[in-house]
């Protein structure tokens, strides 16, 4: 049962020395460190040891979304060339997108932005996201997607101080379905060679898609976390993936979610109590008191203080245990956030394991 403190936003705070924020990914990717968490222990390993840390028959479920070049730089028309940043969030139609804009105060409905050869007009203000609905003036039959690789940049988290030499470093090696505005970072540690070693040990994998959206960037503001709401994100769990998961469970294997996005996608698809194919939007918000329906263990990075991701992990292992593990990680010089190290939360560590 959750403790009343588990619903307090302040109870998810911790102090992280700035030098523990990873500014660059390690190379090779699977040389990152891995804290392996069981019911009673937290052991130090490396990610390339994952095949030996799981059991034959276990099934890894991964998110194959790809980060789009969502950051556009333009000029406000008629404002002496004022620079404008447009951060695309979601395609609403062939011509319209939901976006965050800077400077927001100067971009009211009717404002026109020149982005390369394209003009875009602010239509409305979206109250939920504080963003703008923007309509792009495109040639007939065109969609903005065909312009993004030329006009856009892959957005990096705000705590990353320097651009990457190669933006593929912020994509998983299996990213194939464009649509995310942030990477599913638990998957950044995998390499083709690691997948081969996992297969040799009898550990298979399958994919789903969840396009990571604005919720990644929005801090929790409600003092009582139960009053927080996540922005909807599009996801798909295919019939083939459902069959793979059901077969693995029937054979005695464990379902290991790679990242919090996979947890939310699977739990959405199992909302009826039985995992079923799902294609649509979800705003599932997991925090202490939630009873998982399908996920048994998972891999996740170390998350920002007071974030909904900390609350999700706490729903599985408890808030106090999570904060203890984070302090141990700081003491042991682990690297935090998107390019940082990871945790493998084994089923025995989850107090509400299925």
UniProtKB/Swiss-Prot annotation:
Single GO BP term: tRNA wobble guanine modification
InterPro entries in alphabetical order: QueA (IPR003699), QueA_dom1 (IPR042118), QueA_dom2 (IPR042119), QueA_sf (IPR036100)
Catalytic reaction list: 7-aminomethyl-7-carbaguanosine(34) in tRNA + S-adenosyl-L-methionine = epoxyqueuosine(34) in tRNA + adenine + L-methionine + 2 H(+)
Subcellular location: Cytoplasm
Keyword line: Cytoplasm, Queuosine biosynthesis, S-adenosyl-L-methionine, Transferase
Listed pathway(s): tRNA modification; tRNA-queuosine biosynthesis
A cellular component term, taken from the record's GO annotations: cytoplasm
Domain of life assignment: Bacteria
Keyword Transferase: yes
Molecular function terms from GO: S-adenosylmethionine:tRNA ribosyltransferase-isomerase activity
EC numbers: 2.4.99.17
UniProt keyword Cytoplasm, yes or no: yes
Entry function: Transfers and isomerizes the ribose moiety from AdoMet to the 7-aminomethyl group of 7-deazaguanine (preQ1-tRNA) to give epoxyqueuosine (oQ-tRNA).
NCBIfam families, A to Z: PRK00147.1, queA
Binding partners and assembly: Monomer.
PANTHER family in the cross-refs: S-ADENOSYLMETHIONINE:TRNA RIBOSYLTRANSFERASE-ISOMERASE
Family: Belongs to the QueA family.
Name by which UniProt lists this protein: S-adenosylmethionine:tRNA ribosyltransferase-isomerase
